[in-house]
Amino acid sequence: MKDQNIPFEGAIRWGYAFNQWKLGWQGFARLDDNIRALKVTSAGGFRCIELTAGTGPWDPLGRPESIAQHFGSVRRFAAQLEDWGIARIPGVFFDPGQLSFEEGHFGLCATTRADHALIRQQAGVHARFVAEVGGEYLVIQPFPPYWRSGELSAAALEAVADLINAIAHDSQSLGLDTFIHLDALSSLRSAEQIDSLLGQCPSPGVGLAFDTAELTIAGHDVVALYRRFHRRVRHFHFKDALAVDTLEEYRLPNAERALILAGGRREIPRWFGELGTGRVDFKGLLAAMHELEYRGWVIVESDRGPQPVASSILLNSWYVQHVLRPLQHRPNPAA
């Protein structure tokens, strides 16, 4: 029988994001639901899981304290992963703009220097967890949405760069890399701003996490953008984009709800889709990754996909196994 497991070793290491199971901080709170989700993801062929930083008792796998409470310790949890078909947790995604009961805030802002100490403290909690389970990286989404902060000033960009450098310094002491994630609503909008940010974060331990759908929705050509920044792209989130924000509705108040959830003026029913169903040129991107010798993690996502979540995982698994992985072994994957 053919091995259905998707490789997590080699030049491209495949994994899956756990965030699609939990839509809202109070949802998907039962421990047994989370364990079933790990089993379903493994059954789909993905044996590595990127966790998302969470908060409170409603998120059993969102904090190391919660994990220790449920499993006795972080190490016991890591040792038990194989029982559910999961080989490893390579990293955690951390958005300081989300509320945290443990740190006592309703969202912090990386452009505000007064928030830096607490963001750094919170990042350290998750970085130490990643190190303890044998992972490799922390992904941070540092920029606030445009509708909250407006145009990104040079001073604000410098503040974010200083915070990233501080977090990267802490993470490197644990043997981890730090990857910067940009989303469709981010106050950082242009390639020139990315250039400026990277110039202020020169450490080899700092890289970009390219989210194919988020960047496409924001109006970027992901393949061209990857070619421009390939030396610093160290991580990918693979998901498809079903539309582009051509009306610049990222400026709308509460754009997370007004645009992403409600669809904006065009009433887009769904922004994110399974691989191969939308606007992202995955074949062209894989060709560029092959040509430019990308080595690192590719984490597939089902962000806000339809219920049941398992169907998106299986469709993405099919696309990876039958379309993308065969292209990895061709001299010209785009052909």
What are these regions (language model features)?
Residues M1-E136, N165, G207, A287, ...:
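N-terminal pre-domain/capping segments
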Residues E50, P90, V139, F179, ...:
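Conserved beta-strand positions in the central sheet of alpha/beta enzyme cores
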Residues S173-P202:
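Basic- and aromatic-lined ligand-binding clefts that recognize polyanionic substrates
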